[in-house]
């Protein structure tokens, strides 16, 4: 990476630190950091590529375009939002992050260079979160932090899919894929996030299915299905890592089931337009008198915040990403993308990373969307 770009990535590092480890409660400093870093990122991206907005919408594929349209709708929702400024900023944030990723991945002209940049970027994200969470929040070996586990899960699914697909597998690429796979596995192994782990299993199942190992896929799907159907098995493992707590208790502690019920009730009041991007969980927080910073579900969150229109836009984005990865699965990189996208979509059932505040999961899923475009344009070498 050329040194002239260092400030852009310094700003991004500060932004992700703010998102992960600086609570917005109790003052405006954290919010100011987020605003300054985000608009600093946009200013520098615009400086390096003046046509970035037009390029991102007019010259990319339907996946990137649908991402931008979804969050433009989120910006528009500030006109009727419960918290107008809040909705406007959060939606605009996801547009700026997409522009940043379109610019970043667009710098690479070869597939191997592009893939390496993506993998190192994702690994840096989840290692940063896994290490700093232990240093700043909870100094234990086993942690419960969904963003790091989820990003690691998507990375692991991608690497596993590409290892099985065995396209362009020179020794350097094999070592990179295997190294990133085992780092991802280590982070997942030391995480008690049920959503992240089950999503990773689902992504790996998809990798087996389309990477030439359908028998393994059936076995993996059976494991995932068994864990969903037989909750006592899940509770058994929960008690190993989180003594005295089962899945129901954990969900009740975070308020998920209570918040979901309230969001569904609120969705019925504004079915078409919703309460404004990222706002429905805030309305639920006021009504229930609890802290609910996240809807913990993309589908419920999008329906509550952006109504049926926003939900259909979100489904369209995920569907087109899956479709393009599936139809191009015979090309290098796309089996990995298909597995990682499946993992990310499954993750949306436990964390609303597309329906509210952005986090590392949002960054990685948006990266997958952008790569569905760039993987088809770069050279093999």
Give each language-model segment a name.
Residues 1-49, 72-81, 134-137, 344-349:
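N-terminal signal-anchor transmembrane segment
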Residues 1-5, 166-179, 330-331, 352, ...:
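A juxtamembrane structural motif centered on a specific transmembrane helix
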Residues 37-53, 155-168, 309-328, 367:
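Hydrophobic, aromatic-rich transmembrane alpha-helices
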Residues 38-44, 337-347, 353-381:
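Transmembrane alpha-helices of multi-pass inner-membrane enzymes
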Residues 64, 106, 173, 306-345, ...:
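Hydrophobic transmembrane alpha-helices and their immediate junctions
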Residues 71, 75, 97-103, 107-137, ...:
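Alpha-helical transmembrane segments of multi-pass inner-membrane proteins
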Residues 186, 208-247, 264-269:
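A membrane-periplasm/extracellular boundary helix in multi-pass inner-membrane enzymes
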Residues 245-306:
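Long extracytoplasmic/lumenal interhelical loops at the membrane interface
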